Amino acid sequence: VADLFDNIVAWLLDRALSDESIESTVSELCSRLVEGGVPLARVSVGRTVLHPVIGLMDMAWDRETGKVETNALTRDIVRGMTEFNAPFGTMSRGETDRIFADLTDPADVARYPLFAELAEQGITAYFAAGRTYGHRQELFDTYGKSFRGGSVSFATKRFSGFSKTDLEGLERLIPPFCVCLRIADDRFVATGLMG
């Protein structure tokens, strides 16, 4: 019997081949998870882009608004990020492929400035993971020097944090979600360059 996460994996793989925007995919992914009982408060997505001007794209979904906000960082800005002390920065440098934090634990909160901000907002647990697309490549001199890929983080305000089942399921979503990201990135570059 397929569970919530099996169904979402299948949906993500179908979605990767559709013409839907990555923003609508993120929005619907979050809705499906919340409707399935996963206590999401916030989801953040970051990815490098092989584009002549844009270096990084990020998106953030917030449960209170239900909206997905998208931002693009130019390559010049990315090159200036010499000390990017954040979970996505740690993963992009290849120091780890996943990060979990109990944001009710002061030791975990102290790991990154972002964790202190999230804890102030009532976030109790944070999980992030990502994937590299193909071989590591020299893209930037500083930030994620040899990283081309995508990362996603999930955060909750539930008092007890994420359950073991939540975390195992969210981890299963990372590869198919990163397939969606890569296809969206390729589409973004092709549209920008070819019109």
Where are these regions (language model features)?
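Regulatory sensory and allosteric helical modules in signal-transduction proteins
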Residues: T65-A129
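Helix-loop-beta substructure at the N-terminus of cytosolic sensory domains
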Residues: S18-K67
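Signal-transducing coiled-coil/dimerization helices and immediately adjacent hinge/linker segments
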Residues: I183-G195
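Short amphipathic alpha-helical segments
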Residues: D6-D14, D19-V34, R111-A116, L167
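Regulatory and interdomain segments flanking nucleotide-handling catalytic cores
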Residues: V38-A41, P52, D108-Y112, A184
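Short, glycine/charge-rich beta-strand/loop segments that flank catalytic centers
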Residues: S44-H51, T104-D108, G130-H135
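Allosteric cytosolic regulatory segments
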Residues: S151, E171-R182
